[in-house]
Regions:
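Sec-dependent, cleavable N-terminal signal peptides
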Residues: 1-21
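Surface-exposed repetitive/solenoidal architectures
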Residues: 19-682
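Residue-level detector of functionally pivotal "anchor" positions at catalytic/ligand-binding pockets or at interdomain
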Residues: 677-709, 715, 730, 769
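C-terminal tail/sorting-segment detector
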Residues: 683-686, 692-694, 748-776
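Beta-strand signatures of extracellular beta-sandwich domains
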Residues: 721-725
Length: 776
């Protein structure tokens, strides 16, 4: 940094002789510091006998309003001449002494550089320098043309602590900070800034505390900012704490507004390659261009234990995000959250782009975008090519095109995460790709142990969990209703990849105001991939080509069922409308009805079946139409009969059957995940720790009365029991399960119920009934 001083010094390497009328008491030592009693004394610091490495102390408040009328005959500065200006361009301009404000106030200090030089109260605080216990109010510091400005110092290599700034205005083209222009391997701690910071002439590095926090050893700690920060339209790297951060920022509390600027704007910093810890930003962001976010514009470092709670984060073009614009491949974000309203042409609740790691984090609020095609909006991350784990979004997503509750486009890894907000396109029949969790999962995308519960409304290719899947999705589910115009499903709109151990419970219908819809499937609209161990229980209502599980299958579906009610007018099928490829070990247990008297081409199991069905069943009691030769017709009461399934491949491996169940259920719903052997190498599925919907609890019985089993789902930890009552309400038996944590538990209820008779089985936790199941 010395080289920067030398270069910028130009013709000013010769120190000017500055007049001063200061007459300070003291000896300049730690025991007897020079005493600054008035403005004339302040101007004398660092000049003549008052050395740049001496000790100084304020003994009174200083009114510096006289600086407004001062000019320099030898320098470009109007007003106060910065301490160290006499040695500008040399190392002697560093203040390496101690300046103790003793909690006194310097007010109305005015310093303006008209030409090519920076300004502040100090030119530079050196590596040994200390400025502390100082208050400044109503000061005005400005540089018109080049480089840096700050209320306290242009540059800091030392220590600035316990400083309070109120109503100051600082402006410069670049490296502009409320306290310091550039903090290079120095420390700024226990400081407060309230005022205005302006970046002019479309330059970079503007911050509420420091313009640039450079060097790995630079530290900003325990600071508060309430700044009105503005930049010209093409200014870059703006943050309410620091324009850029290469060091450490810890415990920052931020309020205010950051307005204009081009790219890389953040509530803490525009760009971070260092560490940010325990920061809270409540500042609103209004920017013109990309990578604008509530905390950091662009991150390649570490961010942890931090949050954004902002009323508004807005970007005119190319995207805004609640927490970070871009998290690069080296970036790590953990234990952080955002609660904000985000609006741009593309909006992300937490991030626009993630190539690094995000874990244990969440987003809440609302995500909106302009009503135009070609842009993406999501509740958590717009595009993920990295890793996201143990995170969630409760944000609502409202826009037109390409929407998702958690990640719009995923080609990375997502594990143990969920989304609960709605995904709505304003009831438009146009627009493409909507997912309650992910919009599009690419061929390299892997999603495990995740779920979505929000309603999804989209023009086409809409799914309760994913709009379009080309990758792998394992052990995930969706419970939200889906309304669309074409190619939509309770779990997926289109599937070209692999879906294992998944289910959907939401109902399907048309967009409001549109009676017509096409290709709806209770689980998936169009399948051109591989699905194994999956089911759908929601009702399906679509005019053209609906199916209880899938509308059109041109892939492979194994070990699957649909139990909802299906209604349609044209080519409506119980399990599938059109099957072109392979179905195996599948059944339809719901009902099939025509939605209009002018219906055409129903199919109790399938309407068109040029493909193969190996071991398929349908509920003949639920179909009022002609028998279907594509699958075996079975009375609903007989669907739990074990002999029906003797021919099914690996039935005992994948299915559970007992007199407590109306039809077979899949083993994976009990928390056991049997290995699936595909065409290639075996797919190994480790038993996952499925996340559970907050507030959702469940008791699911299976097996026989003599060997009764249960799947217990808990949304919180607590002392858990299962109680069995007879029809008179008399308690018959209590099965103590002890302390159970949040999650899915497989429990043994052998001997809990009698061999005959109706019993009410109740799940209790901490003395409160959570769920009931009637055993007939």
């Amino acid at each position: 940094m010395i080289k920067k001083f030398m270069v910028l010094a130009g013709a000013l390497l010769v120190a000017p002789s500055l007049a001063t009328n200061g007459n300070m008491s003291g000896a300049g030592t730690a025991e007897s510091p020079w005493q600054i009693a008035d403005y004339e004394d302040l101007k004398a610091v660092g000049i003549g006998d008052y050395s740049m490495d001496g000790h100084y102390v304020l003994v009174a408040d200083i009114d510096a309003s006289a600086s407004r009328n001062e000019t320099s005959a030898t320098d470009s500065t109007a007003g106060f001449q910065p301490i160290g200006i006499a040695y500008f361009g040399t190392e002697q301009s560093y203040f390496d002494g101690v300046f103790d404000g003793a909690n006194h106030t310097i007010s109305k200090l005015y310093s303006m550089s008209n030409k090519e030089r920076s300004t502040a109260m100090f030119m530079a605080v050196g590596p040994k320098g200390v400025v502390k216990n100082l208050k400044m109010t109503d000061c005005y510091i400005t540089v018109k043309y080049v480089w840096a400005a700050g209320s306290v110092a242009v540059m800091n290599f030392g220590l600035i602590e316990n400083v309070e700034i109120k109503r100051d205005t600082v402006s410069a083209p670049s490296n502009t900070g409320g306290i310091v222009g550039i903090n290079e391997n120095g420390t700024v701690r226990d400081v407060t800034f309230e005022g205005v910071v302006l970046g002019i002439h479309d330059r970079d590095f503007i911050g509420g505390i420091v313009g640039a926090n450079t060097g790995a050893k630079s530290v900003i700690r325990n600071v508060k900012v309430n700044a009105d920060m503005r930049s010209s339209y093409y200014g870059n790297n703006l943050g309410l704490v620091a324009g850029i951060n290469e060091g450490t920022i810890v415990s920052a509390e931020i309020d205010g507004i950051l307005e204009h600027g081009n790219r890389f704007l953040g509530g803490v910093t525009g760009k971070n390659s260092g560490t940010i810890d325990s920061c809270v930003s409540r500042g609103s962001i209004f920017s013109m261009h990309e990578n604008s976010a509530g905390l950091v514009g662009y991150n390649s470092g570490t961010i942890k234990n931090s949050s954004v709670e902002a009323d508004s984060i807005y970007c005119e073009y190319r995207g805004a995000a609640g927490f970070v614009g871009t998290n690069d491949s080296t970036g790590v974000i953990e234990n952080s959250f955002v609660k904000a309203n985000v609006h741009s042409d593309s909006s992300g609740g937490f991030a626009l782009y993630n190539a690094g790691v995000i874990r244990n984090s969440y987003a809440e609020g609302s995500m909106t975008a302009d009503s135009m095609p070609g842009h993406c909006v999501s509740g958590f991350v717009v595009q993920n090519v990295g890793t996201i784990t143990n995170s969630y979004s409760k944000a609502d997503v409202d826009a037109f095109h390409k929407l998702a509750g958690f990640v719009f486009r995923n080609s990375g890894k997502i594990d143990s995460s969920y989304a609960t907000g709605h995904v709505l396109n304003g009831e438009r029949a146009s627009g493409d790709t909507y997912g309650g969790f992910v919009g599009q999962n690419d061929s390299t995308g892997i999603i495990t142990n995740s779920y979505a519960t929000g309603e999804v409304v989209g023009g086409m290719r809409a799914g309760g969990f994913v709009g379009i899947n080309h990758g792998k999705i394992h052990n995930s589910y969706a419970t939200g209703d889906v309304r669309s115009y074409s190619e939509f499903g309770g779990f997926a709109g289109n599937n070209y990849g692999e879906i294992l151990y998944a289910y959907a419970t939401g109902s399907l219908g048309s967009i409001k105001g549109y009676a017509t819809s096409y290709s709806a499937g209770g689980f998936v609209g169009i399948n051109d991939g591989y699905i194994n161990n999956a089911y759908a229980t929601g009702d399906v209502n679509s005019e053209f080509t609906p199916g209880g599980f899938v509308s059109r299958n041109i892939g492979t579906i194994k070990n699957a069922y649909a139990s909802g009610n299906v209604s349609g007018r044209i080519e409506f099928g119980g399990f599938v409308s059109t099957n072109v490829q392979n179905l195996e070990n599948v059944f339809f247990a719901g009902t099939l009805k025509a939605s209009s008297s002018d219906y055409n081409a129903p199919g109790c199991f399938a309407v068109q079946n040029p493909g193969t069905v190996k071991d398929g069943l349908y509920n003949k009691d639920g179909c009022e139409f002609e028998a279907d030769s594509a699958a075996k017709a079975v009375a609903f009461a007989d669907m739990k009969s074990a002999p029906l399934y003797k021919s099914w491949t690996d039935f005992d491996k994948f299915w559970v059957l007992g007199d407590t169940l109306s039809f077979p259920h899949l083993v994976f719903t009990t928390g056991v995940y049997p290995e699936i052997i595909g065409d290639g190498p075996p797919i190994e599925i480790a038993k996952p720790n499925m996340v559970v919907v907050k507030g959702a609890n469940g008791l699911k019985l299976y097996g026989t009365r003599q060997s009764l089993q249960a799947m217990v789902t808990l949304s919180r930890s607590g002392l858990t029991n299962v109680k069995v009552y007879n029809l008179k309400g008399t308690l018959q038996k209590t099965v103590s399960l002890g302390m159970l944590g949040e999650g899915v538990h497989h429990v043994n209820l052998n001997g809990a119920v009698d061999a005959h008779g109706v019993a009410l089985v109740v799940l209790e936790q901490n003395g409160k009934a959570l769920s009931r199941s009637l055993l007939r």
